[in-house]
């Protein structure tokens, strides 16, 4: 954790060739895999999802950034830094927050200690049918979801009578 101007910031890294502009001013939840040491001393792994917004990457108001609508480059390490709360980062323990949130979601983790985690932020805005005639479907990651759906549909509907080669690729 780091901080600036009375805010606790989450240290993140951009994965892959990300389009960075859409991450600004979105309600972001956090999810992924958490590795814990159980009360009995067993190393365990579980999936975690905050299920609610816990972070935001704020953009500057237009009067503080007059060039915001002109061509600009975004520095991921400087500009894409999610805020998670007000306060002193020295007083906030992310692993403790994870342990408390996991325990709230599932009591079996009550005395477990978080050892490590691999988490990602995601936009919690729900998909929608949009347009005055409801002709559009809007959603984050729609390109990936549609290509997976089309590929899976092709696999399911493949005709056994004729030989064909289908390839499934996962980018997770």
Question: PLM features: residue spans?
Answer:
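N-terminal hydrophobic/helix-forming segments and targeting peptides
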Residues: 1-171
């Amino acid at each position: 954790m780091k901080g600036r101007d009375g805010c606790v910031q989450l240290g993140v890294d951009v994965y892959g060739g990300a389009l960075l502009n859409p991450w600004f001013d979105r309600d972001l939840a956090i999810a992924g895999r958490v590795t814990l040491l159980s009360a009995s001393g067993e190393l365990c792994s579980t999936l975690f999802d905050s299920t609610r917004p816990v972070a935001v990457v704020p953009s500057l108001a237009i009067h503080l950034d007059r060039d915001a609508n002109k061509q600009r480059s975004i520095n991921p390490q400087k500009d894409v830094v999610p805020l998670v709360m007000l306060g002193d980062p020295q007083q906030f323990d992310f692993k403790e927050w994870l342990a408390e949130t996991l325990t709230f979601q599932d009591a079996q983790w009550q005395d477990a200690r978080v050892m490590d985690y691999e988490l990602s932020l995601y936009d919690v805005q729900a998909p929608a049918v949009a347009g005055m005639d409801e002709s559009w479907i809007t959603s984050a990651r729609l390109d990936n979801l549609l290509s997976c759906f089309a590929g899976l549909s092709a696999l399911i509907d493949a005709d056994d009578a004729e030989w064909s080669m289908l390839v499934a690729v996962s980018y997770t």
